[in-house]
Amino acid sequence: MYQDKILVRQLGLQPYEPISQAMHEFTDTRDDSTLDEIWLVEHYPVFTQGQAGKAEHILMPGDIPVIQSDRGGQVTYHGPGQQVMYVLLNLKRRKLGVRELVTLLEQTVVNTLAELGIEAHPRADAPGVYVGEKKICSLGLRIRRGCSFHGLALNVNMDLSPFLRINPCGYAGMEMAKISQWKPEATTNNIAPRLLENILALLNNPDFEYITA
């Protein structure tokens, strides 16, 4: 019988492409008995272009590589100091629709930021989480065979300047924010556990096993 348990992998700082490839392989080979997984990772500097991404939104990438991704959404930036959380969930088994998963991920971030005294909100016209008009978390998913992969990227204490080289998520002039603007002591090390606790709460507190790379 299937046990509701999630494997949580803390992967540290990693290049984007091998992690993306591993996500695909996991999703392609999983079956109904495979445990769901959540991967916590930071990436070396990279722009990723979503499936519907338009080249004109990449203004001047310079020395930062641009990699095509099959997630939803437009171009975004990943770099050290940004907490990425990939959600490898069997949606059918969890009785979750895609829209419900998006809402759950946004609420995970809103709840995490609320614990820090930062008031944040999602936007109906542009997926992600915002503080005022500034975007603090990007979101992009792919569903294959009823299972999700990709996830969210929360700006913690990263260098935001590379976002100026693109139209983030396809919005010209979109301003970005990071947690350390309000909480200078914030790091991915102290934000990741909060993020994990909040998503597990919204998934009805399944058992989980923590695995470090």
UniProtKB/Swiss-Prot annotation:
pH dependence: Optimum pH is about 7.5.
UniProt GO BP: lipoate biosynthetic process; lipoate metabolic process; negative regulation of gene expression; protein modification process
Site (Lowers pKa of active site Cys): K135
Listed result of changing C169A: 1% of wild-type activity
Catalytic machinery residues: C169 (acyl-thioester intermediate)
Pfam families: LplA-B_cat
GO molecular function: catalytic activity; lipoyl(octanoyl) transferase activity; transferase activity
InterPro entries: aa-tRNA-synth_II/BPL/LPL (IPR045864), BPL_LPL_catalytic (IPR004143), Octanoyltransferase (IPR000544), Octanoyltransferase_CS (IPR020605)
Entry keywords, A to Z: Acyltransferase, Cytoplasm, Transferase
Localization (cell): Cytoplasm
Protein name as catalogued: Octanoyltransferase
Gene (name only): lipB
